[in-house]
Amino acid sequence: MKKLRSYYSNVRHHQNHHHHHHHHSNIVSSERKWIFFPLLIGSIFALFLLFLTTTLTSPTGGVRFLPFTRPVLLTGSGSSAFVESKIKPQQISSLPSPPRFAYLISGSAGDGKSLRRTLLALYHPNNRYVVHLDRESSREEREELHGYIKNSSLFRRFMNVHMIEKANLVTYRGPTMVANTLHAAAILLREGADWDWFINLSSSDYPLVTQDDLLHIFSHLPRDLNFIDHTSNIGWKASQRAKPVIIDPGLYLNKKSDVFWVTQRRSIPTAFKLFTGSAWMALSRPFVDYCIWGWDNLPRTVLMYYSNFLSSPEGYFHTVLCNAEEFRNTTVNSDLHFISWDNPPKQHPHHLTLTDMTKMVNSNAPFARKFRREDPVLDKIDDELLNRGPGMITPGGWCIGSHENGSDPCAVIGDTDVIRPGPGARRLENLVTSLLSTENFRSKQCK
C-alpha cells in the first residue's frame, strides 16, 4: 500500500543500524484490494482486477488473507507509467498476514453498559479482549456484565473475551491503574494466544474505524512498533508530579479513597530519564513481554518508583520504553486517539459531542475519547463510520449474514481471515503514513 512498504523497510533498517541516511525508494507496495468491480471491462488492468477478485476474494466481497508474510510489491524495471507493466502475476498471493490485537477495556461504577457497547464496536473473532469493572462498581453490575459475556454464543464460540471477575481496586491517578493494566497484559500473555499489539482503552473510548480497517493497515507494519505519545520535556510536571511523593491507599486498603501527599519531596531521578505522555497506547507484544517478565530489572525498578508518582499511567510505560535500549527505537509518537483538550490541558479532556464529528473524522485517528454514556454522537459514529446496528457487533468480512430488515450480518459467521476494509482504512493509512514520515518518525522518538 502507498508508501507503507518503503517505511516498513526504512523502520527495519533503522532498528538494525542507528545511523542511516534517509532515501526514498521507488518500491510501491500494493494495498489489499478495495473491492469495486472495474468499470472499463475492455482494459487489461480491469481484466486483471477481475481475475484477482474472482480468485482471491470470498463470495461476500472481502479479501482472503493468504499464508504469506510479505506485502505484494508492484515492482518493475523501466519507466512505464502504466501499472500493468509493473505487476508480477506470481506475486498476487503475497499478502501480508493479518495481525491480532489484544484489548483491555476498563470501567468503573455505572460503566457496564458503555463498556459492553465499546466491546461490541471493537469485536473481531481473531482478537483477544480483557474487560474489567473496578471494585467501585456494584457486584450486581459486574455480574450483569459477566453474565452477558458468558451467555453470548459468539463469545463462547471463539473464547476470546475474558472478564476479570475478582475486581481490582483502582484509584484514579494512582499506580493501581498501572497495576490493573499490567494485570490484564499478564492474563493475555498467560492465555498464550497469538496477538501482536496490546491496546488499553476505557469504557469512555470509542473506535472511529472498523477492526477490518485497523487489521488491513497494521498488517503492513512491523510488529514491534510501539504507538505511545511521549516527551521528556516534563515542564511543570517536574514540580507537581515528579518531586511530590504520593501514597495510593488502593495498594493496601479494601475501601477506595483518594491518593494523598506526604510532606517530604524527592529529587528528579538520575538512574533513568523521566518521560510523560498519554495514558492510552498500543504496545507491541515484545515490549509487553519485557514489562511483565522483567528479565532486565528496569521495568521492575521503574514500577516501584512510580508507585509514589501522581498520574503514573501517564509516565510508567513511557519511561520504561525510552530508557530500554532494545525498545527506544521502536516508538511512534502517537496515542492513536482524537482527544479534545483545553490549551493548556486540564486534568480532564472535553466530552466529545455531535459538534466534534467532523474534527474526529478529519483527525484520521482510529480511536477517540472522552464520550458521555449513550451520547448521540456514538449513534452517528455507528451509522456513518462503523455501519453498526443498535446492540450489534461492528460487521466485518467474517460476517456473511443479511443486513435486510435490521438483521445482524454477524449472526452468520464466515471465514474469520477475510477482511473488508472501508473508508476508515484510507484515513488510517494517511495517519500512519504521516507518523512514519521522515519528519515525524525518528525525529520524535524519545526526545
UniProtKB/Swiss-Prot annotation:
<keyword id="KW-0812">Transmembrane</keyword>
<keyword id="KW-0808">Transferase</keyword>
<feature type="glycosylation site" description="N-linked (GlcNAc...) asparagine">
    <location>
        <position position="200"/>
    </location>
</feature>
<feature type="topological domain" description="Lumenal">
    <location>
        <begin position="55"/>
        <end position="447"/>
    </location>
</feature>
<keyword id="KW-0328">Glycosyltransferase</keyword>
<dbReference type="InterPro" id="IPR044610">
    <property type="entry name" value="GLCAT14A/B/C"/>
</dbReference>
<keyword id="KW-0333">Golgi apparatus</keyword>
<feature type="glycosylation site" description="N-linked (GlcNAc...) asparagine">
    <location>
        <position position="151"/>
    </location>
</feature>
<dbReference type="GO" id="GO:0015020">
    <property type="term" value="F:glucuronosyltransferase activity"/>
</dbReference>
<protein>
    <recommendedName>
        <fullName>Beta-glucuronosyltransferase GlcAT14A</fullName>
        <ecNumber>2.4.1.-</ecNumber>
    </recommendedName>
</protein>
<feature type="transmembrane region" description="Helical; Signal-anchor for type II membrane protein">
    <location>
        <begin position="34"/>
        <end position="54"/>
    </location>
</feature>
<comment type="similarity">
    <text>Belongs to the glycosyltransferase 14 family.</text>
</comment>
<dbReference type="Pfam" id="PF02485">
    <property type="entry name" value="Branch"/>
</dbReference>
<keyword id="KW-1133">Transmembrane helix</keyword>
<feature type="glycosylation site" description="N-linked (GlcNAc...) asparagine">
    <location>
        <position position="405"/>
    </location>
</feature>
<dbReference type="GO" id="GO:0005794">
    <property type="term" value="C:Golgi apparatus"/>
</dbReference>
<dbReference type="InterPro" id="IPR003406">
    <property type="entry name" value="Glyco_trans_14"/>
</dbReference>
<keyword id="KW-0472">Membrane</keyword>
<dbReference type="GO" id="GO:0000139">
    <property type="term" value="C:Golgi membrane"/>
</dbReference>
<feature type="topological domain" description="Cytoplasmic">
    <location>
        <begin position="1"/>
        <end position="33"/>
    </location>
</feature>
<keyword id="KW-0735">Signal-anchor</keyword>
<feature type="glycosylation site" description="N-linked (GlcNAc...) asparagine">
    <location>
        <position position="329"/>
    </location>
</feature>
<comment type="function">
    <text>Beta-glucuronosyltransferase involved in the biosynthesis of type II arabinogalactan (AG). Modifies both the beta-1,6-linked galactan and beta-1,3-linked galactan present in type II AG. Transfers glucuronate to beta-1,6-galactooligosaccharides with degrees of polymerization ranging from 3 to 11. Transfers glucuronate to beta-1,3-galactooligosaccharides with degrees of polymerization ranging from 5 to 7. The addition of glucuronate at the O6 position may terminate galactose chain extension. Required for cell elongation during seedling growth.</text>
</comment>
<dbReference type="GO" id="GO:0009826">
    <property type="term" value="P:unidimensional cell growth"/>
</dbReference>
<keyword id="KW-0325">Glycoprotein</keyword>
